[in-house]
Structures are given as C-alpha cells and as structure tokens.
Amino acid sequence: MFGSNRGGVRGGQDQFNWEDVKTDKQRENYLGNSLMAPVGRWQKGRDLTWYAKDRAPCTGPSREEELAAVREAEREALLAALGYKNVRKQPTGLSKEDFVEICKREGGDPEEKGVDRLLGLGSASGSAGRVALSREDKEAAKLGLSVFTHHRVDSEGPSTAPTAPRKKPRAEDKVEPDAESHKKSKKEKKKKKKKHKKHKKKKDKEHKREADSCSSSPSPPRPRHQRHSDFSPCSKRKREHSQDSGRNPSRRRQDRSSDD
C-alpha cells in the first residue's frame, strides 16, 4: 500500500555515482556545472582547483621586517637632518672599464701601472708639498690663468729622481707682464675719467645752487615813488577842494578875485 506503483528506483545517495554523470550523453544539456564532472573544452583537461593549492613560500622579508627597516631609515634621516648624526658618504670606486680607459689615455698597459700611481684631477691637492710652483707659474696663477700641476711622481721617491735643468722663460711668459701693465694703465685711465666726470658734476651742481639762490633771494626794496593816481586831474581837484575847505571864506574870495 505504501510502495510506489511505478517501476524503477527514485534514486538516493547510495545509488548516485559521478561516473554515470560524466558518461551521460545529455550532460552538456544539464543546468549548472560541477568540478566533479567537467563539461566542454574549457573544463576538460584543465586544473580547475588551481586557486585552492598552496603557493610557493615568499623568499623576501616579511611585512613586519620591511616596516621596521623603513622606520629605522626614517629615524636616521631625521637625526641627520637635525644634525645629531654625521652622514657617511661612501666613496665611488673606479670600475674596470674606467681603469682601462685611464690606462689607454696614459699610453701604457693596465698591468704595469697601479691605481695609486695614476694622478687624476684631484692629485694637485694631495701632492701640493712635493710640487713647487715656479715664479712664472705663480704670476700666471695671480692673473687667473691655468697652471699645469700634473707631474709624474716616480715610485723611487723625490730624492733619487734626477733634477731636471731649469727651463728658460719663454717669450709667452715675457709677454704676460706687458699685458698686465697694459691692463693697469687701462684701469688708471678709467679711474681718471671717472674722477673728471665727478668733478664736472660737482661744478655743475654748485652753479645750479648759486643760480637757484640768486633767483630765490628777495629783490631790494625800490624807492617809493608817488602814485600814478596823484598825478591824475581828479586827485588834483580833490586836493584843491580840501585846501579850499580848510581856508577862511574871506581868503577864498580874495583868491577868486585875484584869479579873475
């Protein structure tokens, strides 16, 4: 009564097998894919579980070590900036290629010469005690000309080296003092011209000041002259009238009779 009327089996976990799924003809038509039964050319023959495998261990330092190294470098840079620590500058050594080039310039084999025997641009300061400048070289240095100080130093020492005869001064060295005197005379001429110009400017300023003082000084007071109005006929009449008004009437009559 409780059993199924249909034939066959509904299927359970004990009756399921992945091999049957792989070999099924209609597998590609089923919805969904599974790693246990890959389908198609993109899944067959490929490692589908590559992401789950362990990776190779990193050979580099760990994150904590990197952070500690960065903090230490920052601390050293801060101390150097504040002046609590002296920065050590590592000298850059010569490479093999540079050494071979220097030997080629000198014109010898690199095996015959050592690095200590080669004198470069910085050798003048180190061998200043051994190289004595001549009087001509000193004069040239005063004028600002370049002085050749690269002398070859023998390994035996300066005492055993034969003293070379002193060279005679060349014509170029003789010309240098003349050029110096010519420059001095030019400078003196320029100074004289400047002094003359200054003197002229001073004179012009003095003349201008005198002219300004003359123009600004008040003019001398002119003698008082009689006004123009005093000579006019109206003023004459007024004066006569005032004089007549001051006289007695009897006098006025006498004057009029005398005028008649």
Curated annotation (Swiss-Prot):
Residues 1-21, 106-133, 146-260 are annotated as: Disordered. This is Multiple myeloma tumor-associated protein 2 homolog. Residues 183-206 have a biased composition (Basic residues). There is a cross-link at residues 22, 104, 113 (Glycyl lysine isopeptide (Lys-Gly) (interchain with G-Cter in SUMO2)). The lineage of its organism: Eukaryota, Metazoa, Chordata, Craniata, Vertebrata. It holds the Pfam family MMtag. Keywords: Isopeptide bond, Phosphoprotein, Ubl conjugation. Residues 106-116, 170-182 have a biased composition (Basic and acidic residues). InterPro entries: MMTA2_N, MMTAG2-like. Residues 117-132 have a biased composition (Low complexity). The keyword Lyase does not apply. Disulfide bonds: none annotated. The modification Phosphoserine is found at residues 123, 127, 215-216, 219. Residues 1-11 have a biased composition (Gly residues).
